[in-house]
Amino acid sequence: MRTSISLLLSTAAVSLAWIFSGQGAWAQQSATSTEAAAHIVVTVEPKHGSSPPEIRKEDVMVYEGHDRDQVVDWIPLQGDHAGLQLFVLIDDESGMSLGTQLDDIRKFIESQPPTTKVGVAYMQNGIARVAQDPTSDHAQAAKALRLPMGAGGVNASPYFSLSDLVKKWPATNERRAVLMISDGIDRYYGTGDLQDPYLDAAIDDAGKAGIIVSAIYTPGAGHFAHSYWQSYWGQIYLSELADKTGGEAYYIGFTGAPVSFVPYLQTLEKRLQNQYLLSFLPKPEKKAGWRQIRLQSEIAGVDLISAGRVWVAAEEK
């Protein structure tokens, strides 16, 4: 998922609107092909330095197993295609230490470009309580920030709330992303292990909707705020969620709060500025389902970051 290119394509605007208005990262009819193309947002990340080199369509390779798929489009999400809806999703179970970060979150929201609409929601009892719908009025969005309730039992599972946000978020012709601020602990599921079904469901929901989730860890309230075991699993869950949706999780500190969110917010901003829409032709299958994919580039020194799978509709008869 990374930046800058200047692609031609007179059909790009039509293609982009068609792709995103449907939901995102699954196969739909491509405006550039009579075959069904799958679409996924990719972030381009330099291995060294701060600015990635130019990546062209012919530099991108998509694999399903050992089979290479045809790349149809590679559109830089800049200029006329820079539209983004970004939700800041805050866990109301967070401890009061989050209060020291609110000013930096507010500055991050207010610094977004005019092409970005920002929304704010709070996780409460498994529901995403929307305090501000996505808006281009960034000052208005920033006003929706407040201290978390920090009361035990407020949040059933942060992953219930994420799924709820995804399902109530209207389809749009813009890219969509979530910044999730939470300790990641699933108090509803209880024990920490690799089988949390609510985390898996949230990953599926976000993936099918083409929504990239990034996360910043912040300690919760009460006993879990200083439980190494619970904090460990909470951060593992946040990392898995971000990795599997094409985002990034920040701060592996376990029981303590991050000193500052600023480095993470700056990194997130750079990621959002270096994204492309990739369209490719997956192998035809009779049944709809997830396809595991692997991205490579002919250009040295860059990583192409995306969800590791894409939802593909059944082959039309």
Predicted regions and their residues:
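Bacterial N-terminal signal peptides
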Residues: 8-22
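Scaffold/interface architecture of coatomer-like assemblies
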Residues: 26-317
